[in-house]
């Protein structure tokens, strides 16, 4: 039978856990960049757009956690749609929304000022997320799955009994 093999629940769970762990690392990097970037003397460009890049990578990974059966390309499309909606929502100025944007959580989640350059940073961040997801998937396949296949090949080779 040709075609895609059915995805096992344990593999989906493992993929989601890896993506969640990566998302936590990306969040820590993003917060560190925002809080310590200027005191460390990093250029404003790096702090601003590096944070946007990491935000989009986080969105990609979290969409992957929530929808593990989707392909990385499908996850990227959804993450890009979320990023575009969030960026263009900055053009909407309702009092309650502007008040939320003034909070730390609002600034980190939604941002404050519309910028087309953010869309470029988001695209790069999503591409980075696809790349990272692929590297982790190949690492997991090379490191985790072969244990089971080696065991099965050893069992198959021990039929001399």
Stretches with model-predicted labels:
Residues 1-141, 152, 161:
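Bulky hydrophobic segments
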């Amino acid at each position: 039978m040709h075609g895609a093999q059915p995805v096992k629940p344990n593999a989906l769970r493992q993929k989601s856990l890896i993506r969640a762990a990566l998302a936590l690392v990306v969040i820590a990097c993003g917060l560190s960049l925002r809080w310590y970037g200027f005191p460390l003397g990093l250029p404003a460009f790096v702090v601003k757009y590096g944070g946007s890049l990491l935000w989009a990578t986080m969105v990609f990974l979290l969409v992957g956690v929530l929808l593990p059966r989707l392909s990385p390309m499908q996850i990227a499309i959804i993450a890009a749609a979320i990023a575009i909606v969030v960026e263009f929502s900055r053009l909407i100025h309702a009092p309650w929304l502007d008040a939320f944007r003034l909070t730390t959580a609002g600034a980190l989640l939604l941002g404050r000022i519309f910028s087309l350059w953010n869309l470029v940073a988001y695209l790069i961040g999503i591409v980075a997320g696809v790349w990272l997801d692929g590297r982790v998937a190949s690492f997991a396949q090379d490191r985790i799955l072969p244990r089971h296949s080696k065991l099965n090949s050893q069992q198959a080779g021990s039929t001399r009994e």
